[in-house]
C-alpha cells in the first residue's frame, strides 16, 4: 500500500502525548500493517485518530456506549463494513485516552509505544467491521491483531506473562 493511499488525520485534543509527528508515524505504520495483513486493495481512504484524555473519552463512552467510565480506545466507523470486505473511502474515527493507555502499559509491563500500536490496530479493525462481542468474534479479531503486531515486531499483547 502506498503511503498516500490512506489519509490519516491526527488530532491531539488533550493529554500529555508525544509529539504529533511521532504519533503520526506510529499510527501510519500500524494502519499500513493492518491493511496489508487483511489483503485489502489499495484505495484512497481516510480516517482520523484523536488523542485525548480520560475525561474526554469517559464522556464519549457514556454517551455512545452507556458506560460512564474511561476506556483505552473507542472506534466510530463512518459506515458499516462486514469484516473482511473492502471498505469505502471514509473509514471513521479512532479515539485514544492517554491516562488509561499509560496505566495499562505500566501495569502490563509493556512499552507505551507497543501498547499504543496495539490499540491503533484494535481500533482500526473495529472500523473495518471486526468485533469481539462473542468468543468466536474475539478469536478472529485477536488473531488478526497478533498477526499484524507480529509484522511490526511487537510481542503478542494477549500473552500472559508469568
UniProtKB/Swiss-Prot annotation:
UniProt keyword annotation of Disulfide bond present: no
Domain of life: Bacteria
One Gene Ontology cellular component annotation held by this UniProt entry: cytoplasm
EC number from the UniProt entry: 3.1.-.-
Coiled-coil stretches noted in the UniProt entry, renumbered to this chain: none
Function: Single strand-specific metallo-endoribonuclease involved in late-stage 70S ribosome quality control and in maturation of the 3' terminus of the 16S rRNA.
Keyword Cytoplasm: yes
Chain positions recorded as Zn(2+) binding sites: 122, 126, 132
Family of this protein: Belongs to the endoribonuclease YbeY family.
Keywords annotated in UniProt: Cytoplasm, Endonuclease, Hydrolase, Metal-binding, Nuclease, Ribosome biogenesis, rRNA processing, Zinc
GO biological process: rRNA processing
Enzyme class (EC, first level): hydrolase
SUPFAM superfamilies tied to this protein: Metalloproteases ('zincins'), catalytic domain
Protein's cellular compartments: Cytoplasm
Pfam family, one: YbeY
PANTHER family referenced in this protein's UniProt entry, alphabetically: ENDORIBONUCLEASE YBEY, CHLOROPLASTIC
This protein's name: Endoribonuclease YbeY
Cofactor: Zn(2+)
An example molecular function term from Gene Ontology annotations: RNA endonuclease activity
Co-factor: note: Binds 1 zinc ion.
